[in-house]
Amino acid sequence: MITTKRLRLELSTLIGAAIALAGTSAVIGADEAAARALARQSNCFKCHSVDKKKDGPAWREVAAKYRDKPDAEATLTNHITSGEKVKFEDGHEEDHAIVKSKDPKEIRNLVDWILSLP
C-alpha cells in the first residue's frame, strides 16, 4: 500500500527529473509575474521574501547558495514539492508547504525565477 507521503515523494522525484531533463539554464527566461503569482497562491511569502529573512531564508540567499550547483533545480524542486521537514532557528521542525501546482512548467518557472535572483 502506498502512503500519501510516499506518493508525494515519488511525484516530486518525477517532477524534478522532468525539469532536469528539460535542460535549459535556470537563469534564462523565467516569467517573474507567473512565479510571483504561484508563490502568492502557495503562501510562500508567509515564510519567505525576495530580500529579507523571515521564518525562511530570503530567496536571494537561496539563489546565492544553490545557483552554481549542478543539482540546484532538482534540489529546490524537491524542496517545494515533497513536504520535507525544515528546521527553524528556534529548533522546531515543520513540514515545508507544498507548492500549489502539479504543472512541471509552473514549478520549474518558480525555481528558475528564484535561482535567477541576483
Segments predicted by a language model, with ranges:
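The canonical Cys-X-X-Cys-His
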Residues: 42-50, 110
